[in-house]
Amino acid sequence: VAGGTPALAQDAFGEAGVYAPHGHGLAFVRGATPWSRRGYRGAANRELWLHSGDGEYVRLTEFDGDDDRPSWVDGHSLVFLSARAGRKNVFRFNLVTGEVRALTAHQGSDVRFPRASVNAGLVAYELEDAIWTVQAEGSEPRRLRIDVPADELANPVERRTAGDGAEDLAVSPDGTLAAFVVHGELFVTE
């Protein structure tokens, strides 16, 4: 906050790092599997790690597959993506007990980008073309209804040729525009 030269937070190769809410510890992902390579098992598995801040690294997950995208729920638990049950779903990991449990069980497509709200205990994530939420303590996942107001699909200005029946003609003071009514509709022309 006071400024100065940036310093390296940790020297392990990794990505998707998130600091713990209390500021002591960085959860991150190590591994080189492309996220699009579903079902990979091998040496490049993506696993969750914790850098404690005092130089110690702790491997958090040891699933023979990919664990990815950690997000802190509170100071002692994370949510993350895992394909432990086939498709990628949201799981919760308790750092104190080591317990891992599923928060979602979607079958059709992989879940993407889970993010926990530390204050509200809510996890939001993307599934197909929608945003979903689930309670960090566990609940039935809920698809959010998002209505986005949009512009009209067509231009409201319509060009037509008016024939017989024009009435109520008025010309602008500078003589560049003329307005008139045909069958109860107002028309403006140059």
State where each predicted segment sits:
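Short, basic/low-complexity N-terminal boundary segments at the transition from targeting/disordered tails
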Residues: 95-99, 104-117
